[in-house]
Amino acid sequence: VCSSDLNNPAELAKIYSSIDSIREDDNYRIARIKIVGYSSPEGNYDANARLSEQRAKALVQNLKHAYKLDDSMIECRSVPENWEGLAAWLREYCPSYMQKVLDIIGQTPEPDARDAKIKAIDGGKIYNALLREVYPKLRLVEYTVSYTVVPFSVEQGREIIKTRPDKMNHNEMYQVAVSYGKGSDEYNRIIDRKS
């Protein structure tokens, strides 16, 4: 799972790089890509719902174009206002106003009313600080790439264990070791490696 600001070419390059690292490895197959777009909580809820959906769909279109992905491989959704992200930031950094804002988030179910109550704290100073320092970080797209490991034969395993043993689990290593015969030098070397 990674987060990204799609307006930043460096972040988009990171997304491509993570997908490329899976696509270029013959041992993996991409099964699904999940995209979630978020907007920060300021402003009108309906407008934020549109923005978060647009963020998510923009990345979907970008990936579909770059990788010729089928619709069935992509799950796309959006979160209109990233209140969970704001609460997580508050808990992590513990500013003096943390509890006031957390109470508003927890006790005010209507998003636009939450926003108005936060604006009212300390004459808007806290809201303006959040707007400047925190809210930009809450406008993002998260993506998760799910993949499967392609099964390989014992012969392929013998090659993989020499060059990329980190790609093998203990059972696969054991199968390769047994293929050399219990007690053989190769068997012992592999068994010692996996311990």
Residue ranges of each PLM-predicted region?
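Alpha-helical tetratricopeptide repeat
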Residues: 137-138, 155-156, 166-178, 188, ...
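Residue-level recognition of well-ordered beta-strand positions that form the cores
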Residues: 36, 144-146
